[in-house]
Amino acid sequence: MSRPSSRSTLYRLIEAGQLAHKALLQPLLERGLEPGDDAILFELGRAGTTEMELAAELGLSEVSLTTRLSRLLDRELVTRQAVGPELAPGIALTERGVRIRNGLADHWTQLEEALMGELKPKQRKKLGERLRRFVDLLRL
């Protein structure tokens, strides 16, 4: 059995994952946001929704989501408003929330391009498939 080595592909994958995670957190922390707030902003970027639907989509308890939403409401990133055809009480992004969400999405795209930029479309697809398979194996 081989010893773990800093030259191994797995080591580099772990290192890249940790550095990418840190790079994705940086713009959140600079804006006074917490890890996970971006998931809320991205989900609300699709459309306003009810708190119950948002909690279910993100896999959060309603109590946990309420705490996060209170902070985002205080920072004027989200607002309470009627959503959907039934005009149910819900939550949506403010203009400021949309700008911050777009900035975070742009940052994500830049990191993705740094990773995949030199690859041709078929190579990108194959890499994505291999990483997905590896993740699936690890989840067993």
What role is predicted for each listed range?
Residues 70-132:
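Charged, amphipathic alpha-helical coiled-coil/dimerization segments
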Residues 11, 22-64:
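N-terminal helix-turn-helix DNA-binding core of bacterial DNA-binding proteins
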Residues 1-31, 77, 99:
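N-terminal leader segment of winged-helix/HTH proteins
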Residues 14, 42-46, 105, 132:
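Short, locally clustered residues in the helix-turn-helix/winged-helix DNA-binding domain
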Residues 1-4, 122-140:
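C-terminal regulatory/oligomerization modules of transcriptional regulators
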